């Protein structure tokens, strides 16, 4: 396998239970909340001027969009095109790690807030990375 470029890989710390489920093939998606600031900068594509790139399939060019817009249940921005997730259990120096292929993504709204007429207006969004094969797996050394 060709070594992936850093721009193709998203580093994510993860709990051991979820790591083990992904490695064993039980869990096929990894979910992360998209929030203004650091997390949005990790997950959402920006153009050369620093603005989030709109998803042309569900937005209008002359309309302003924000990360918490419900937008008819369609997330208005494009994700960064990661090809792999580099998963690491916790933050210790010795830990389990894996490089996992990303086969796709989707955005899912949750905690939808409605306007005065009862129509959905705002939402917190989660990006779901759809996972493929485990490309590399490194287990921490057990000390006796």
Question: What are these model-derived regions, one by one?
Answer:
Residues 3, 7-9, 13-144:
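Structured alpha/beta reader/binder surfaces that contact nucleic acids or chromatin modification marks
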